[in-house]
UniProtKB/Swiss-Prot annotation:
The keyword NAD applies. This is tRNA uridine 5-carboxymethylaminomethyl modification enzyme MnmG. NAD-binding protein involved in the addition of a carboxymethylaminomethyl (cmnm) group at the wobble position (U34) of certain tRNAs, forming tRNA-cmnm(5)s(2)U34. FAD binds at residues 11-16. GO terms for biological process: tRNA methylation; tRNA wobble uridine modification. GO terms for molecular function: flavin adenine dinucleotide binding. GO terms for cellular component: cytosol.
Length: 629
């Protein structure tokens, strides 16, 4: 095997697979190095993809020809649209996965990717060139692998430690060794490291669960795919089930809190605020006597069940005792105990918008190493890091950065939040984090991003053709609709009351009426039934929310004006006397690329922004004057 590559990606999880595939799609000769090839694409925790805001990320990854959407469509065994009864901005696709089928799909997609090689290697160190750039990696056997750029996607493996009661085990995932050398290397290079914690629930034997006594939770029919390339889901579908904890469950937990590593002081890392362990729920929400649990089968031919909602690191005997108090699980057998895992992460404020590090050019970080939680957040970062690693490896500093701003997608919101605000707890994406969420819907991710992907060169021929077909279908549908305009008397004869103002109205004009939807339009104009469902959805949303969308486009224009005001990379914030010491410190740490990014730093005031803008303009003026003296 060659020891020189354009891009080397370390780690075969969700961030690593997207990074490697993205780099290869841009033509980079890419190596994906991971401990075990059989674990590539493994779902370490919950067997599901998507959800609120997370589903938006998956659709955006797919719009740029990424892996995750296609893989879950092949391996998904239950598909749902969450928040279907709410507005389109907050609807999120989610799919339950067959773990084995999902991992197989990921590996198959990677195997079909030209220019990508996978190798079982334990990477222990980084290679630094004489020019101070990251020049490759060194494996556990001392082998040197050179590259133009390196992407670290180490997940929970950086100095990972598993906790089950008082028992601690160094591991990156249960049964797998941690990455100790890389953590030491990052510390030696001066990267600011922190410690985070996440957890997983016990796995249950589904054959010992009393399913008949539980509430069933079926998926949507027909199953809504993730990928814009998928026409239909062909994998057999299953139902999940719902149960809940009881007062007795909470008593068992409270009586054993002294044995919980989370409360004994054994765990120092900060856990995810929005995905707490069951012991944390019982303490934080002491007034509640029950918490919902979703019983999620892990595969069509696998009896393992994932009880979503009872992540725990309590001792095994306590886990068994609390399971026996839950309806339907009284006789359930535990196949594997739940556990917590602590791991190192890097403060993401030392990254730029391409996810390249400021301390070591040529090194990119993606996934949980940047303080995030969730498969989808990791995959999104992997995509961005992989694309930029390929550009840097091919063109060096001349490479135009590949970035996404907050008005382009959740991809941009995610990266901007991380590099501007940093995080002290595992970061999770929510629709509430996106200011322009009505524009950044899951349903229009391809219309927002695929053209950009085509221009960048990361979108293949099949997706390009599908995208052009959809755009042509939208144009044809609008032309047809414009020819269906009717006068108020004509509409009245069809049972639709409008102002008798003499103005002709198209079918889309009528969607501002709360009682009129697309189905009613088709009943009135049968020819509309020939329009593709995905195209009809775009037309309906665009018409129904036209006023809101127009105002939001105005907001985006104002946002882009601020983003266009670039702050010099070498700006010495310590010398800005008009700013408080606190703000000078925050600006020095975050080093925002634009005035807009500076405005999003906590504590930044309008007065401080004005002072910053004046300083930059004065500096530019002085620089121009020097050129003529």
């Amino acid at each position: 095997m060659t020891n020189h590559w354009d891009v080397i990606v370390v780690g075969g999880g969700h961030a690593g697979t997207e990074a490697a595939a993205a780099a290869a799609r841009l033509g980079a000769k890419t190596l994906l190095a991971t401990h075990k090839l059989e674990t590539v694409g493994t779902m370490s925790c919950n067997p599901a993809i998507g959800g609120l805001a997370k589903g938006h990320l998956v659709r955006e990854i797919d719009a740029l020809d990424g892996v995750m959407g296609r893989a879950i469509d092949r391996g998904g065994i239950q598909f749902r649209i969450l928040n279907r009864s709410k507005g389109p901005a907050v609807r999120g696709p989610r799919a339950q996965a067959d773990r084995a089928l999902y991992a197989q799909a990921v590996r198959a997609i990677l195997a079909d990717q030209p220019g990508l090689t996978l190798a079982a290697l334990a990477i222990e160190d980084l290679l630094i060139g004489n020019d101070g750039r990251c020049a490759g990696v060194i494996d556990a056997e001392g082998g040197v692998h050179r590259a133009g750029a390196v992407v670290l996607t180490t997940g929970t493996f950086l100095r990972g430690v598993i906790h089950i009661g008082t028992q601690t085990t160094p591991a990156g995932r249960i049964g797998e060794a941690p990455a100790l050398g890389l953590s030491a290397t990052l510390a030696r290079l001066g990267f600011p490291l922190g410690r985070l914690k996440t957890g997983t629930p016990p796995r249950l034997d589904g054959r010992t669960i009393a399913w008949a006594t539980l509430e069933s939770q079926p998926g949507d029919e027909p199953p809504p795919p993730f990928s814009f390339l998928t026409t239909a889901i062909t994998t057999p579908q299953i139902s999940c089930a719902i149960t809940e904890t009881t007062a007795e469950t909470h008593r068992v937990i409270r009586e054993n809190l002294h044995r919980a590593p989370l409360y004994s002081g054994q765990i120092q890392g900060v856990g995810p605020r929005y995905c707490p362990s069951i012991e944390d729920k019982v303490v934080r929400f002491a007034d509640r006597d029950r918490h919902q649990i979703f019983l999620e089968p892990e595969g069509l031919d696998d009896p393992t069940v994932y009880p979503n909602g009872i992540s725990t690191s309590l001792p095994i005997d306590v886990q068994l005792a609390l399971l026996a108090t839950i309806p339907g699980l009284e006789k359930a057998e535990m196949m594997r105990p739940g556990y917590a895992i602590e791991y190192d992460f890097v403060d993401p404020r030392c990254l730029g918008p391409t996810l390249e590090t400021d301390r070591l050019p040529g090194l990119f970080l993606a996934g949980q190493i940047n303080g995030t939680t969730g498969y989808e957040e990791a995959a999104a970062q992997g995509l961005i890091a992989g694309l930029n690693a390929a550009r840097v490896a091919g063109a060096g500093e001349r490479a135009a950065p590949i970035t996404f701003d907050r008005a382009e997608g959740y991809l941009g919101v995610l990266v901007d939040d991380l590099i501007t605000l940093g995080t002290t707890e595992p970061y999770r994406m929510f629709t509430s984090r996106a200011e322009y969420r009505l524009l950044l819907r899951a349903d229009n991710a391809d219309l927002r991003l695929t053209a950009k992907g085509i221009a960048l060169g990361c979108v293949g021929a099949a997706r390009t053709a599908a995208f052009e077909d959809k755009r042509a279908a939208l144009t044809a549908a609008r032309t047809m609709i414009d020819g269906l305009a009717l006068t108020p008397p004509d509409l009245a004869r069809r049972g639709i009351a409008v102002n008798q103002d003499g103005q002709r109205r198209t079918p889309l004009d009528l969607l501002c009426h709360a009682d009129i939807d697309w189905a009613r339009l088709v009943a009135l104009w049968p020819e509309l039934g020939a329009i593709r469902p995905d195209v009809a959805e775009q037309l309906e949303i665009g018409a129904r929310y036209a006023g809101y969308l127009e105002r939001m486009h105005g907001d985006v224009a104002a946002f882009r004006r601020d983003e266009a005001l670039v702050l010099p990379a070498d700006l010495a914030y310590d010398g800005l006397a008009n700013l408080s010491a606190e703000l000078r410190g925050k600006l020095t740490l975050a080093r925002p690329a634009t005035l807009g990014a500076a405005a999003r730093i906590p504590g930044m005031t309008p007065a401080a922004l004005t002072a910053l803008l004046r300083h930059v303009k004065r500096r530019e003026r002085d620089s121009v004057e020097e050129c003529f003296t």
